[in-house]
Amino acid sequence: MHSGILIRGRILGSRTANRDNNSPQHILGVGIQKADGFGGTTQDVEQVKIPDQLVQSGVVNQINSLIGKLCEVPINVRSWSMNGKNGTSYTLSFESGIQEIEELIYVR
């Protein structure tokens, strides 16, 4: 069982970016659907850092098998402040894996 924060959204895939020290950083993309205020929906993309240890354990293969599927992603949240900038970063949690969930279809 997971205690903490879960992001629920559609898995978009993973990519690799370079950190400031030029080492690779793996990132998971999660699409979050939300109402657009006009009767439709739009999608925000949350970027979740993947720790090197999880990359080495094969989590990127799991992510690739879940592309396009609705999932719950366990994350750790960290606020930061550096060089006059502030932000929040999300990191994939070691506590539990990414879980595919059933899509609910609402009929009006």
From Swiss-Prot:
Signal peptide: none annotated. Pfam families: Putative_G5P. InterPro entries: Putative_G5P. Keywords: DNA replication, DNA-binding. The keyword Repeat does not apply. GO terms for molecular function: DNA binding. One of its GO terms (biological process) is DNA replication. Transmembrane segments: none annotated. The keyword DNA-binding applies. Coiled coil: none annotated. Belongs to the inovirus G5P protein family. Binds to DNA in a highly cooperative manner without pronounced sequence specificity. During synthesis of the single-stranded (progeny) viral DNA, prevents the conversion into the double-stranded replicative form. G5P is displaced by the capsid protein G8P during phage assembly on the inner bacterial membrane. Homodimer. This is DNA-Binding protein G5P. It comes from Enterobacteria phage I2-2 (Bacteriophage I2-2).
